[in-house]
Regions:
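N-terminal secretory signal peptides that target proteins for export/translocation
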Residues: 1-6
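Bacterial N-terminal signal peptides
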Residues: 10-19
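Extended ligand-binding clefts on enzyme/binding-domain cores
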Residues: 27-62, 91-95, 130-135, 148-154, ...
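Solenoid-repeat scaffolds in large eukaryotic assemblies
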Residues: 101, 113-114, 175, 182, ...
Length: 432
């Protein structure tokens, strides 16, 4: 049976603080009061909106096929048993995309795609020995040539979680022992003591993920790297003897997010210090105010994930979801742009994206941000959340008016958001 044939718990199927109505009848959208770790159930917000679950599942499968196998795909097979995810506009394969692809694949029970991606990542990206042992080079050319040799910590975060889920879903008796692969990353990181400037990708003292585990990046972080519920997955199933540490990481990450997000706008900077204070950044010689840019788009969806799975910070996360949706609504639900200063003012300089003829400049109403703000509905409790969900349902990932097109980042964030709001982004527990 495919993952779409398994029980999806919509408000029409289970009541967790929500009134039951007909399966295709629109309902009031209200966040659940318990998370998937406890209930083993996941909302289908689209079903609550009145869409039949079969139609929702078919649309999700179509979006998966678009991203992985369609004319504008970002998943490319290599030989008989490997594949990579490409940030096409930057002409590379990144640990971000590789680990995202693996997470999508394990969530949707696509074992072939998962194994192909991990086989490529292990062969070309992962260091098997030396100071970087266990880590992954963050950027490679499609032929496997390393472009950026250092790790980016969010890649390791997603690799570990996806591998633990693969172990739980498929077992460890095939080509890979997924659990051992996850433990290899975690154990290798834990053993690092600063030799050659390489440290653990999660700071042992403050329990917060680093921007990078090498160079200057060990001294600060990125709000979009913070997904507290992932640490709770590790605490339950990584089986490496560090469960208490991971639980402390989850708590520290939630506390850090409280300090990092503007209470009036719901916005955060792309990077900041561990205490939540701003870092003064420069780009192309320009001094820039702390701004919500491309990395930051992920934060609304990450907080929605933590709410959906753990529901451990309900009051703050619901207030956050309402605040950030209110901010973008105030900018025009169909016209808000994808970069703002944290205080909500317009940026003086728009960060470009892509390279060469695929480069995009300026700001736009990006579908990736439309998607992640809609995903925040899992935690929101106000009426306008429905409008954001509707915009996601009606969205398409296609070239913008200026010709810019991002099949990779926009495409993957849109896919993740559909997974969340269809009830198909779950804690994957061990098979019983």
């Amino acid at each position: 049976m495919s993952v779409f044939g398994r029980a999806v718990m919509s408000a029409a199927a289970v009541a967790v603080g929500i009134c039951v109505a007909g399966a295709a009848q629109a309902q009031e959208l209200k966040p659940w009061t318990k998370g998937g770790f406890e209930t083993h159930q996941y909302r289908s917000v689209f079903a609550e909106m009145g869409y039949p679950q079969a139609e929702v599942d078919a649309k999700l499968e179509a979006i998966f096929q678009e991203v992985f196998h369609g004319p504008d795909k970002v998943y490319f097979e290599v030989g008989d048993d490997m594949a990579y995810m490409s940030d096409v506009k930057n002409f590379d394969a990144r640990t971000e995309g590789m680990s995202y692809g693996m997470m999508v694949a394990v969530q949707l029970d696509k074992k072939e795609e998962f194994d192909r991606l991990f086989r490529w990542a292990k062969k070309y990206m992962q260091y098997q020995d030396g100071p970087m042992k266990g880590y992954f080079a963050w950027s490679l050319a499609p032929d496997g040539t390393i472009r950026g040799r250092g790790p980016a910590s969010d890649g390791e975060l997603y690799f570990v979680t996806a591998l633990v889920f693969a172990s739980n879903r498929w077992g460890n008796d095939g080509d890979f022992n997924y659990l051992q692969e996850a433990q290899f990353i975690l154990n290798s990181s834990w053993e690092k003591d600063g030799t050659d400037g390489i440290k653990p990708f999660i700071d042992k003292e403050n329990h917060l993920i680093t921007f990078t585990p090498d160079g200057r990046g060990v001294g600060y972080t990125d709000p979009s790297y913070h997904i507290p519920a992932f640490y709770e997955v590790w605490a339950r199933w990584a089986n490496d003897g560090r469960a208490d540490f991971y639980r402390a990481c989850a708590a520290a990450s939630r506390e850090y997010l409280h300090k990092s997000i503007d209470p009036n706008t719901g916005l955060n900077p792309d990077t900041n210090n561990f205490d939540g204070s701003f870092i003064e950044n420069a780009f192309f010689g320009r001094r820039m105010k702390p701004a919500f840019r491309f990395d930051s788009w992920r934060v609304p969806m990450n907080i929605a994930l933590d709410y959906s799975w753990a529901c451990a910070d309900r009051e703050w996360q619901t207030n956050y979801a309402n605040t950030i949706q209110n901010f973008f609504y105030s900018k025009g639900i169909d016209t808000f742009v994808d970069q703002y200063n944290v205080d909500g003012t317009d940026v003086d300089f728009a960060m470009p994206a892509g390279q060469g003829e695929l480069r995009g400049t300026g700001t736009r109403h990006s579908v990736g941000l439309v998607a992640t703000v809609a995903a925040a509905t899992l935690a929101a409790d106000h009426a306008i959340a429905r409008e954001f969900v509707q915009r996601l349902w009606d969205s398409q990932n296609k070239p913008y008016e200026d010709g810019y097109f991002d099949a990779y980042y926009d495409g993957l964030l849109r896919l993740f958001a559909f997974m969340h709001l269809s009830g198909h982004y779950r804690v994957i527990e061990p098979a019983k």
